[in-house]
């Protein structure tokens, strides 16, 4: 599953891009619900990774 590291700047770019709404705002960083995230199966790229300016969304 994907997860967001502490380098998250809380910019909010990723949340609206998630096709399965697995991303939500945490206390200090955005978080990905591992049970919901399907890593954008069937799409050309992982939507959140593609838009993250901090490059902090990584494979878990």
From Swiss-Prot:
N-terminal signal peptide: none
Record's keyword terms, sorted: 4Fe-4S, Electron transport, Iron, Iron-sulfur, Metal-binding, Repeat, Transport
Cofactor binding: number and manner: Binds 2 [4Fe-4S] clusters.
Superkingdom, taxonomy of origin: Bacteria
Gene3D superfamilies in the record: 3.30.70.20
SUPFAM superfamilies: 4Fe-4S ferredoxins
Gene Ontology MF terms: 4 iron, 4 sulfur cluster binding; metal ion binding
Binding site for [4Fe-4S] cluster 1: 8, 11, 14, 52
A Pfam family hit: Fer4
Domain 4Fe-4S ferredoxin-type per the UniProt entry, residue ranges: 2-27, 28-60
Keyword Nucleotide-binding on entry: no
Cofactor: [4Fe-4S] cluster
Positions bound to [4Fe-4S] cluster 2: 18, 37, 40, 48
Function: Ferredoxins are iron-sulfur proteins that transfer electrons in a wide variety of metabolic reactions.
Protein name: Ferredoxin-1
Organism of provenance: Chlorobium limicola
